[in-house]
Regions:
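Long, low-complexity intrinsically disordered regions
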Residues: 1-125, 129-131, 137-204
């Protein structure tokens, strides 16, 4: 074990397993038991090519996104991102003085469901600079992202985060950030029933 590898043993975010996974040596099996297996042999990409693939996929699935969003997600510099963007057929749009990048025309994507229960650390919350997220009103930022790095499970209603939820042995607890009208409550109950047919939803 090298001096660079030694700190991984005691790292609280995955330890040796994370080091081996990020190094391409271990991966999760597709089985239900969540066992780790050796990764199959593969030929790694050139670092620059790999970055372009990652950025292309990000723009495809998260776009339109701003440079701030991409810097937040990848932890790459603005200069690095601009170089990578220049090699991709990314499209742009202007809104409120900001430039947004994307690969797929937004109008060609399927409509967002009215009500979605998002898991903790959901990619929808992590894919955008949290202070500029199109889904998270700034007033609710600290209710979703706490000071210890936790990202709570949330309710996405009509395209905006509208509350937090948690599950216990008896039911699903929903804490709305604002009062829900009867139509909204009905939509939330319907979505919850589809996910948890054997558990009631309690709106606190």
């Amino acid at each position: 074990m090298t001096a660079d590898e030694e700190p991984w043993v005691f790292d609280g975010w995955g330890g040796v397993i994370r080091m081996l996974a990020e190094g391409g040596h271990l991966c999760l099996s597709a089985a239900e038991n969540r066992a780790y297996i050796r990764c199959p042999e593969f030929s790694p990409m050139d670092a620059e090519q790999a970055r372009q693939v990652l950025l292309r996929r990000h723009l495809t699935h998260y776009g339109p996104v701003s440079l701030h969003d991409m810097m937040y997600f990848f932890r790459w510099t603005q200069r690095e991102l601009k170089t990578l963007l220049s090699a991709l057929p990314a499209k742009t749009l202007e809104c409120d003085g900001n430039t947004y990048y994307y690969m797929v025309e937004p109008h060609s994507l399927p409509a967002l469901p009215r009500c979605v229960f998002l898991a903790g650390f959901d990619p929808v919350m992590l894919g955008y600079e949290k202070k500029e997220s199109p889904f998270l009103p700034p007033v609710h930022l600290k209710q979703v992202f706490n000071n210890t790095g936790i990202v709570f499970p949330t309710l996405l209603l009509d395209g905006k985060v509208a509350g937090k939820w948690k599950e216990d042995v008896k039911c699903i607890h929903l804490t709305p950030f604002d009062n829900l009208n009867k139509t909204q409550q009905a939509a939330v109950q319907k979505a919850a029933k589809a996910l948890w047919p054997d558990k009631p939803l309690r709106i606190d």
